[in-house]
Regions:
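Histidine-centered beta-alpha loop that forms part of the nucleotide-sugar donor binding/catalytic region
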Residues: 14, 92, 117-120, 286, ...
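Conserved beta-strand positions
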Residues: 11, 89, 116, 250-252, ...
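Short helix-capping segments at alpha-helix termini
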Residues: 50-53, 107-112, 271-278, 342, ...
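Radical SAM enzyme core and accessory elements
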Residues: 2-11, 76-85, 103, 109, ...
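Flexible glycine/acidic-rich beta-alpha junction loops that bind and position SAM and/or redox cofactors
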Residues: 18-19, 121-127, 153-154, 210, ...
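Structural recognition of alpha->loop->beta junctions
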Residues: 129-156, 298-306, 364-380
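Acidic, low-complexity intrinsically disordered segments
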Residues: 2-243
C-alpha cells in the first residue's frame, strides 16, 4: 500500500524581548493572534485542496510564542523527519523583528527553509524607497520575505517550498484580495486553551478610510473596506463553538467603518438567539461610531462586552497634526455615554508625546478626562514612528535620528526625540499618566459610574487589576501581559550573556514569589473596593459631571477651555452658521 509523502508547515507568531533581554512568554497569554488564525485557516484550505499533489499531505503546527516555547531542535527534527517542510514567521510587527531574526538564524543554521511576513515587512516595503536593513538581513540569511496578504498566494509559496526553491521576495502589496468566501481564520483548541479567557480572534474586514499619520494599517491593508460576508462570520463562530470557544476579539482596526457592519451584527444576533449561545465580543471602533443609527444598540445585542476606542488625545491641535480629523472632542462625551447606556465597557487608547505635550499638560488633560469623560479605562502609549507609517516615512526622509533597536517599537518605549521633553521627562510623564488615571480614587469613581449605569463592576475590577498592575509588577505593557511569566535563561538576546543557573533560577523564583504577593495584594484591595461599591444602597443614585446627560455644555467643561479647544469650537460654530445660512437661502 502506497504511503503519501508529508510536508510539515510550522507557523510561528514570535514574541519580543523584555528590557532585560528575555523573551516575553506566559503560562497563559493575553491577546490571541489573528495573523496566526488567518494563516492556519488558509493552510488548512490548501491541505484540503491538496495543492502539493495527491501524494502529499500537509501537516500543520501553530505556535504563539507569547504562550508556547519555540523548541528549535524539536521542530527541526520534525521537519527533517517529513519529506519536506518549512517555518513561517507570521504577523511579525516591528518590535518582534529582532526576535524573529534570532529564531530564523537558528533554523537556517540547521538547514530549514524559513519565510517571514507581517506588518514590518509589508509596511517598510510599502513606504520606504529602499529595503529596510533588518529585512535585508533576513534576506541575506536566505529567509524568504512575504509582503501583502496570504489569501490566494500561500499555495504558491508552499509549492516552491516543497521543491526547495523559495523565492527571496514574494511581493503582493499591489494585489490585495477580496475577503468574501476566503478561507476562515481558525486556531486549534489546544492553542486557544493557552490564552487567558479562552478567547480567539477573527477579522470581519480589512482596510480603514482614515489617514492617521501614526498608523501602519492603512499602508498595508489599504483604505478601501474589504469585508467577509455574514455567512463567513457565522461559519467562523460555528467552527469555534464546535471547539467550545465562545469569546471572540474582532480585530478590524475600525469595525464601525466596515460597510457591512449591520448585516454582520444582525447575523450574529440571529445565531446568538437561535442557538442560545453566550457569545461575547471585543471590538475596536472610532469616536464617530455613535453617529451610525443603531450601531451601538446592535453591538450590545450581539454580545459586544468591550469596546476599544481610538481616543488618542483631547487636544484638537494634536489630533489635527496626526491627521486624526475624524476625532471631534465635542463628540467624545455623547459617544461614551451611549456605550454606557448599552452597558458595554469602554477602553480608550491615549497617545503621549504629541508636539505640544509636556508632563504638566499630560497630567492636566488626564484629570480633565477623569472628571468629564465617562470612559472606563485608558491605556497609554508613546507616540512612536512605527515603520510603515507616514510619521516614520517623514522622519526617515528628513534624516531624523530614530532608535535603531526595533525591539523598542512596541509603543512602550521612547524611540525618537521630543521637542518639549527630554527622554527622562517623557518617560516620567508616561509613568505619571498611568499612576494618575489609575489612582485608587479614580478606580472607585469608575466602579461607581459602572454600578449606577447597570454595568459590570466585577469586570471593571478585573481590568483595573491588569492596567494598574502590569507596569509596576511585570514591567510590560498591559496589552503584552498574561498569567505567570515564564523565563528560559537560554532565550535571551544574543548580545547579552547567558546567566549561570546558580544566579538565574534563585532570582527567577524569588521574583516570581514577590510578584505573586504583589498581585494578590492588589487583587484583594480591588475586591474590597468592588464590594464596597456594590453594597452601597445609594449606588444607583450616583451622579457626577461625566455621567450628566449632554446638553449645551461648552461653557462649563474644562475639556473645551484650552486655546486650541476654543479655536476648534469657533471653527465648528462658523461651519454650523454657514450651513444654517445655506438652508435659509434655499
Amino acid at each position: 500500500m502506497k504511503t503519501n509523502k508529508s510536508f510539515l508547515l510550522v507557523l510561528i507568531k514570535p514574541s519580543h524581548y523584555d528590557n532585560d533581554g528575555y523573551v516575553i512568554r506566559w503560562w497563559r497569554g493575553g491577546l490571541p493572534s489573528n495573523s496566526l488564525a488567518c494563516l492556519y485557516g488558509i493552510a488548512m484550505e490548501c491541505r484540503e485542496r491538496r495543492i502539493l499533489g495527491a501524494d502529499f499531505d500537509i501537516d500543520l503546527e501553530a505556535i504563539d510564542e507569547t504562550n508556547w516555547k519555540v523548541s528549535v531542535e524539536d521542530l527541526t527534527r520534525s521537519i527533517k523527519a517529513a519529506d519536506a517542510g518549512m517555518v513561517m514567521l507570521v504577523g511579525v510587527q516591528s518590535n518582534q523583528f529582532p526576535r524573529s531574526l534570532d529564531i530564523a538564524k537558528q533554523f537556517r543554521r540547521r538547514g530549514v527553509q524559513v519565510a517571514i511576513g507581517g506588518f514590518h515587512v509589508s509596511g517598510t516595503l510599502s513606504m520606504l524607497p529602499e529595503c529596510d536593513p533588518a529585512v535585508q538581513e533576513m534576506m541575506d540569511l536566505g529567509v524568504s520575505v512575504f509582503a501583502g496578504e496570504a489569501e490566494g498566494q500561500l499555495e504558491g509559496v508552499l509549492q516552491d517550498a516543497v521543491v526547495g526553491k523559495l523565492k527571496p521576495l514574494y511581493n503582493f502589496l499591489g494585489d490585495l484580495p477580496h475577503l468574501e468566501g476566503q478561507p476562515l481564520p481558525i486556531i486549534p483548541r489546544e492553542q486557544i486553551a493557552r490564552v487567558a479567557g479562552h478567547t480567539t480572534s477573527f477579522d470581519a474586514g480589512r482596510g480603514c478610510p482614515f489617514q492617521c499619520s501614526f498608523c501602519t494599517i492603512i499602508n498595508v491593508q489599504g483604505r478601501k473596506s474589504r469585508r467577509r460576508t455574514a455567512d463567513d462570520i457565522e461559519a467562523v463562530i460555528r467552527g469555534n463553538v464546535a471547539q467550545g470557544i465562545y469569546a471572540f476579539f474582532i480585530t478590524d482596526d475600525n469595525f464601525a467603518r466596515n460597510k457591512d457592519w449591520e448585516a454582520l451584527l444582525d447575523r450574529i444576533i440571529e445565531v446568538r438567539e437561535k442557538e442560545q449561545w453566550g457569545l461575547s465580543f471585543t471590538i475596536q471602533v472610532d469616536t464617530l461610531c455613535h453617529k451610525l443609527p443603531n450601531f451601538i444598540e446592535k453591538c450590545a445585542k450581539a454580545g459586544v462586552r468591550r469596546c476599544f476606542i481610538g481616543l488618542e488625545n483631547i487636544n484638537p491641535d494634536s489630533l489635527l497634526g496626526a491627521k486624526k480629523r475624524q476625532n471631534k472632542i465635542t463628540d467624545y462625551r455623547e459617544m461614551m455615554l451611549a456605550w454606557k447606556q448599552a452597558k458595554v465597557m469602554t477602553v480608550g487608547g491615549y497617545i503621549l508625546g504629541f508636539p505640544n505635550d509636556t508632563p504638566a499638560s499630560i497630567v492636566h488633560d488626564i484629570k480633565v478626562i477623569q472628571d468629564e469623560l465617562p470612559i472606563d479605562l485608558l491605556e497609554f502609549f508613546f507616540l512612536t514612528p512605527l515603520p510603515g507609517s507616514e510619521d516614520h516615512k517623514t522622519l526617515y526622509a528628513k534624516g531624523v535620528a530614530m532608535d535603531p533597536d526595533l525591539n523598542k517599537y512596541d509603543l512602550d518605549h521612547v524611540t525618537v526625540e521630543h521637542s518639549n521633553m527630554s527622554k527622562a521627562e517623557w518617560e516620567c510623564a508616561y509613568k505619571l499618566a498611568w499612576d494618575t488615571y489609575y489612582s485608587w480614587r479614580h478606580i472607585e469613581t469608575v466602579m461607581r459610574r459602572s454600578a449606577a449605569t447597570g454595568g459590570n463592576v466585577g469586570k471593571i475590577k478585573t481590568y483595573a487589576l491588569y492596567f494598574k498592575g502590569y507596569h509596576p509588577i511585570e514591567h510590560v505593557h498591559p496589552l503584552e501581559g498574561g498569567v505567570l511569566r515564564l523565563k528560559d535563561r537560554h532565550e535571551r538576546r544574543p548580545h547579552l550573556p547567558v546567566e549561570p543557573a546558580w544566579l538565574f533560577y534563585p532570582r527567577y523564583f524569588a521574583q516570581t514569589s514577590v510578584k505573586a504577593v504583589r498581585w494578590a495584594t492588589l487583587a484583594i484591595r480591588l475586591e474590597w473596593l468592588a464590594r464596597k461599591v456594590k453594597s452601597d444602597p445609594q449606588r444607583l443614585k450616583y451622579m457626577d459631571q461625566a455621567l450628566t446627560p449632554v446638553v449645551n455644555e461648552v461653557e462649563n467643561l474644562e475639556l473645551y477651555k484650552t486655546r486650541s479647544s476654543q479655536a476648534f469650537l469657533d471653527q465648528r460654530r462658523h461651519i454650523e452658521e454657514a450651513q444654517k445660512s445655506k438652508v435659509v437661502a434655499r
